[in-house]
From Swiss-Prot:
This is Large ribosomal subunit protein eL20. The keyword Ribonucleoprotein applies. It comes from the Archaea. One of its GO terms (biological process) is translation. The gene is rpl18a. It comes from Methanothermobacter thermautotrophicus (strain ATCC 29096 / DSM 1053 / JCM 10044 / NBRC 100330 / Delta H) (Methanobacterium thermoautotrophicum). Belongs to the eukaryotic ribosomal protein eL20 family. Keywords: Ribonucleoprotein, Ribosomal protein, RNA-binding, rRNA-binding. Part of the 50S ribosomal subunit. Binds 23S rRNA.
Length: 78
């Protein structure tokens, strides 16, 4: 049985220095729960931001037509 990946748009903020930086990311995953782990991991490795400083405000499933990120769009069109 093959699991179908879904595309999610995530909005939130993270603390960079003493300022809250807004972010919007588009990620593909099988379940919404995977998004949390991938996002925390990415911010930790790229920005050295601890999980407690990342606030995810909204996660919504989007259709392939709504994708704006060129990398995610290329993955979807395969």
């Amino acid at each position: 049985m093959k699991m179908k990946t879904k595309i999610f748009r995530v909005k939130g903020k993270f603390l960079m220095g003493d300022k809250l930086q807004p972010f919007t990311k588009e990620l593909n995953a099988i379940r919404e729960e995977e998004i949390y782990e991938r996002l925390y991991s990415e911010f930790g490795s790229k920005h050295r931001v601890p999980r407690s400083k990342v606030k995810i405000e909204e996660i919504e499933e989007i259709s392939p037509e709504e994708v704006q990120d060129p990398v995610v769009k290329a993955l979807v069109q395969r």
